[in-house]
Amino acid sequence: MLRLSSNGNLYIYTYLELPGNGNNVWVETYAAFSKKGRSECFLPEMCGSYGLCEDHQCVACPTPKGLMGWDNKCKLPDVPSYNASTAANVGYYKVKDVEDYRPLGDSDGEGPMMVKECMKKCSDEVKCVGFFYRNDGSMCSLAAQINTLAKLHAVFTGLIDAYIKYAK
């Protein structure tokens, strides 16, 4: 049986007929995101509407002032409604060494471009709430939605950073 759970995880269950005792059971035989496979941190809403996940746990709430303790009220900062002067009224804060459920590959996004160019593109885009920047290729990937940020493993330190838009 294939099941899609409310948190976005995909499960496969196998029906086992147990000989002798007559108790038959459904057993989970696969989960797309699990401690055995891809980290649960890559589930879009692992940490609710926003948060930083590391080692299968929600550990922080990224804010313009830095990482704060995570709770279920953690959310993206508000951005001003769009008008001609919006770009001047927004800033960005950096969350280092993270990605989300959409892995940023070598050729994903636009570029090469500098971080400031990517900030301008996001500032000019009404739906952009932030972007992911791949440092090794100077690639920019705008995001209209950001939920759980997954901390990258130590071997990927310095590879991808998120820049979150906020109202100054």
Can you say where each PLM-predicted feature lies in the sequence?
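Beta-rich ligand-binding surfaces for carbohydrates and other polyanions
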Residues: 1-168
